[in-house]
Every structure is written in structure tokens, then in C-alpha cells.
Regions:
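Extended, subdomain-level signal for the structured scaffold at the beginning of enzyme domains
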Residues: 1-123, 127, 135-226
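Alpha-helical segment proximal to the catalytic Tyr-Lys
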Residues: 131
């Protein structure tokens, strides 16, 4: 059996904004994709720019999927995430960036993140992100000199969603930044699920999109039509 491998790349940022709002990765955007991938028999590994334990945000114990992940061996592995510069992205079939506000601070600007995303794309891998995770794609230039997202269809946490959530905390509006780099951006109603697939670029709009995004990635890895 050919086991597929997905690399989760998480933030190391625990605070954001002028009031030092606690943040990190958004818990459901790891827990729900993990459940989908694990059920499909896909192997998951974890990395972050600095390595170690990624800070978390938004845990909801009333969500059974999150509760199960909280008490899983997987979260203990994630607490020992590998330093991204020590990971060979070519060992994986897909890379996935969960959201949370943290990625707006480190994932959005980290040079190693940009190198890994470009290398994964140029090697034919699936590149995926949800919510604020597409900040990873900003500034990524491919081997042929073109920006990764120019002319590509994608989604992310929308300006409308940010206005009611963290506009005072984030250093920029992600939707605006993606559009500025030439992305063909689309979003649905606030907090509703939306997944956009453009070739090997897979994106989800918000927390509600995390599970469906993972399902789309599984289908692609297993050779099913989109």
C-alpha cells in the first residue's frame, strides 16, 4: 500500500496586535483535517518555523473532534514539531497550512516558508491552506520567476469576516494582500464553508472549511475526480 504523507506547517506566534492578543494556530483547523486524513490512512507530520510546540487558539471542548484530538497521540507529536529548515518537503505529497491569527505574523513573512512552498509547488506537490493559512503564499516566487498566486483562483478569511473578528489586531487584511499579488480571490458568506481548487492549489475560507478542504485533498491524493 502506497501511504500518502501530508506535512502540516504551523505558526510559532503566540500573540498579535497592539494589545498582544493571545493567538496561535486555530485548533479546529488542525483537529478536523487531522480526523479526515487519519481516517483516510494518510500519514501526518508537523513542522513550524522554529520547531517545538506551536501555540494554540480557539479550542472548543464541546466539539467532539477537537476533544478527541486534544487527547490523541497526534497532538503530543505536534508538540514536538520539526524545525521547518530541517524538513525535506519532497518527502511529502502535500503541504497544509492551518489558520489562526499567528500565521499573519510569522508564516506570512518567513523566508523558509516561502522556499518550502515554492519547492513543493515546483515538485508537483499539493499546496493547501485554510483561513489565515494562505498568508503562506504571499511573496512566493516559482522557479520560472512567476508569483505562485498570480492569476490563480483561491480563497481565505475574508475582509468581511476579519471586520467582525480581528481587524484591530492583524497587520494587514489577507484578502487585500492576496488580491494585490494577483490572485483571483473569491469568498462566500461569512463563516460559511467554501473550498477553492485551482490545479494543485487548495484553499478554504474559514474554520468551517477546514474539514471539507481536507476531504478535497484526500480525494486528490487518492486519484478521485474533483
Amino acid at each position: 500500500m502506497n501511504v500518502k504523507h501530508v506535512l502540516f506547517i504551523l505558526t510559532n506566534t503566540p500573540q498579535i496586535g497592539p494589545n498582544q492578543r493571545p493567538t496561535g494556530y486555530f485548533f479546529s483547523e488542525v483537529a478536523h483535517p487531522y480526523e479526515v486524513f487519519d481516517h483516510a490512512g494518510i500519514a501526518i507530520e508537523y513542522a513550524s518555523p522554529l520547531g517545538g510546540t506551536p501555540p494554540e487558539d480557539g479550542y472548543d471542548e464541546a466539539d467532539g473532534v477537537q476533544l478527541a484530538f486534544r487527547h490523541s497521540k497526534a497532538i503530543r507529536r505536534m508538540a514536538r514539531s520539526r524545525k521547518l529548515s530541517e524538513v525535506d518537503v519532497l518527502d511529502y505529497d502535500a503541504v497544509f497550512f492551518p489558520g489562526g491569527l499567528g500565521p499573519m505574523m510569522d508564516i506570512a513573512i518567513d523566508p523558509e516558508v516561502k522556499r518550502v512552498v515554492a519547492r513543493a509547488w515546483d515538485a508537483g506537490k499539493i499546496v493547501a491552506a485554510v483561513c489565515h493559512g494562505p498568508a503562506a503564499f504571499l511573496g512566493v516566487t516559482l522557479a520560472d520567476g512567476t508569483p505562485l498566486i498570480r492569476g490563480r483562483q483561491l480563497t481565505s478569511f475574508s475582509n468581511e469576516e476579519e471586520a467582525g473578528y480581528a481587524q484591530a489586531d492583524v497587520p494587514f487584511l489577507l484578502e487585500d494582500a492576496l488580491r494585490t499579488e494577483g490572485a483571483d480571490y473569491a469568498a462566500t458568506s461569512v463563516w460559511q464553508s467554501k473550498v477553492v481548487i485551482d490545479g494543485r492549489l487548495f484553499t478554504g475560507q474559514n474554520p468551517a472549511s477546514a474539514g471539507p478542504l481536507a476531504q478535497a485533498i484526500v480525494a486528490a491524493l487518492q486519484g478521485e475526480p474533483a
